[in-house]
């Protein structure tokens, strides 16, 4: 197929009477590369006997364009469904420059989650690794365990409970400044700024308008290019993303230096945020994280802590507007909690534990529109799975799209039904919005806290209606309504 496409390009070029020199050079290079990689791909396919069925697609880019295209059309399942129907629940493809085996079943999820550091290790595409460098998402083995232990000390429930009142206070202030008194708002941009400000405050006490605005401008460029084909040429989205990441690191570096001075002078507390915690604590060997490690991990948590939560909160507002009976039940639960508080008293950790129905509503939103679509592993040795050979060094991909909306695991999968999560909930390894196993998202409790506190405050103040009930949700790289979810606010009397 590749060779035919190259010939087609050549035939079209011959229709030009005097093709420009640069075009001729580019065309010759393209045909040469296409033919070279066609030969390599053909040779490898013959050499890798017993691998799962599938196709590698185009040279270099593989099937990445179709993979991303399905997401941006709002149909991420299409990429996987078309291939599982043809090849089964384990198939071969090529994504972001890597031969990849995709696992599309609860059994596949369980296998990958339970074989971390045995047969597989966490391994995002190099395009992602180049952005997050020495962060938890890119490290493996002992380095990953060390980072996870340190970060989880801050993100565990026992530590987060101290921040509930702080998050509640910030949420009330955000609603007072941007929602209350408005007839209509654009939900997604407001929620992005809300979750970003929250993450900046809790992770690094970045809360002045100038610092937030400067970081925000770089971050909006950064988030658009995380899952992109890594074409690092001037003007490409990926190139802009790398420059934005460097600018964010530079700003974080200045903040780290200032915080070190403040800690030494006693003008900052070791418990005030993640940054102080990382600067004040050491690992089992008595070593502190380097400044680069701190920058990379705060960058990762700022990305994960704001973009995923704003996506979930936005689709949550959409689903509650579409399902008024669910809204009424959430409102009833939250008013009961509010009624148990003194005037002006902030929420506490114990209040979040009482928000059982509200969390089931959030879980159902995460089932239908999970913020993270899946992740990657790498085979550290050749092994057999389901009768197929998985070569050493290949990427492996698990995806929520293989289980979250499948009728085999969820009856009426398109229906919004929080009751699915009553009792024992869904079958094991079918509901995996935070992943699983040793690499399970360390921020899942942080996300839960953030979602429930916002939900408590928004339903206490408003009901709302969708301006465009038919607004489509796309995935780029996380679920987002195409027009930003404009809603009409209806304040409670």
Swiss-Prot record:
Q: Which PROSITE patterns match?
A: CYTOCHROME_P450
Keyword Cytoplasm included in the entry's annotation: no
| Key words of the record | Heme, Iron, Membrane, Metal-binding, Monooxygenase, Oxidoreductase, Transmembrane, Transmembrane helix
Query: What are its GO cellular component terms?
Result: membrane
Q: How does it sit in the membrane?
A: Single-pass membrane protein
* Cofactor requirements of the protein: heme
Q: What stretches pass through the bilayer?
A: 20-40
Q: Report the EC number(s), separated by commas if there are several.
A: 1.14.-.-
Q: Which family does it belong to?
A: Belongs to the cytochrome P450 family.
From the Swiss-Prot or TrEMBL record, give the protein name. Answer: Cytochrome P450 716B1
Q: Which organism is it from?
A: Picea sitchensis
């Amino acid at each position: 197929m590749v060779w035919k496409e190259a010939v087609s390009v050549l035939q079209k070029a011959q229709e030009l009477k005097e093709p420009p020199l640069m075009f001729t050079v580019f065309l010759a290079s393209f045909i040469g590369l296409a033919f070279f990689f066609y030969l390599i791909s053909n040779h490898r396919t013959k050499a890798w006997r017993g691998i799962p069925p599938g196709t590698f697609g185009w040279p270099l880019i593989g099937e990445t364009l179709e993979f991303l295209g399905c997401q941006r059309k709002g149909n991420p399942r299409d990429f996987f469904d078309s291939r599982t129907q043809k090849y089964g629940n384990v198939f071969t493809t090529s994504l972001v420059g890597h031969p990849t085996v995709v696992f599309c079943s609860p059994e596949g999820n369980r296998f990958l989650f339970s074989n971390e550091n045995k047969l597989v290790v966490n391994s995002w595409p190099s395009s992602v690794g180049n952005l997050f460098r020495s962060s938890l998402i890119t490290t493996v083995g002992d380095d990953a365990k060390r980072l996870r232990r340190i970060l989880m000390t801050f993100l565990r429930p026992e530590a987060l409970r101290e921040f509930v009142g702080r998050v509640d206070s910030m949420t009330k202030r955000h609603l007072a400044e941007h929602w209350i008194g408005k007839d209509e708002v654009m939900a997604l941009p407001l929620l992005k700024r809300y979750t970003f400000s929250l993450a900046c405050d809790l992770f690094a006490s970045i809360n002045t308008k100038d610092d937030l605005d400067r970081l925000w401008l770089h971050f909006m460029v950064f988030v658009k290019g995380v899952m992109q084909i890594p074409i690092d040429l001037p003007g490409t989205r990926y190139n802009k993303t790398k420059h934005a990441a460097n600018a964010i690191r530079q700003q974080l570096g200045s903040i780290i230096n200032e915080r070190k001075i403040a800690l030494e002078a006693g003008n900052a507390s070791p418990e005030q945020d993640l940054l102080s915690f990382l600067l004040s604590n050491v690992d089992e060997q008595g070593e502190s994280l380097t400044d680069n490690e701190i920058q990379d991990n705060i960058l990762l948590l700022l990305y994960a802590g704001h973009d995923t939560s704003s996506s979930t909160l936005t689709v949550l507002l959409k689903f509650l507007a579409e399902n008024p009976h669910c809204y009424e039940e959430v409102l009833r639960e939250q008013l009961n909690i509010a009624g148990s508080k003194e005037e002006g008293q902030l929420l506490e950790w114990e209040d979040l534990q009482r928000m059982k129905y509200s969390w089931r509503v959030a879980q159902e939103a995460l089932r239908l529109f999970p913020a993270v679509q899946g992740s990657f592993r790498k085979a550290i040795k050749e092994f057999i799975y389901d009768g197929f050979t998985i070569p050493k060094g290949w990427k492996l991909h698990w995806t929520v799209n293989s289980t979250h909306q499948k009728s085999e695991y969820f009856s009426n999968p398109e229906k919004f039904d929080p009751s699915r999560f009553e009792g024992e909930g869904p079958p094991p390894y079918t509901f995996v919005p935070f992943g699983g196993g040793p690499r399970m998202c360390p921020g899942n409790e942080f996300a839960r806290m953030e979602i429930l506190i916002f939900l408590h405050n928004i339903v206490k103040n408003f009901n709302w209606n969708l301006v465009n009930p038919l607004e489509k949700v796309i995935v780029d790289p996380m679920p987002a309504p195409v027009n930003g979810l404009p809603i009409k606010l209806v304040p409670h009397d």
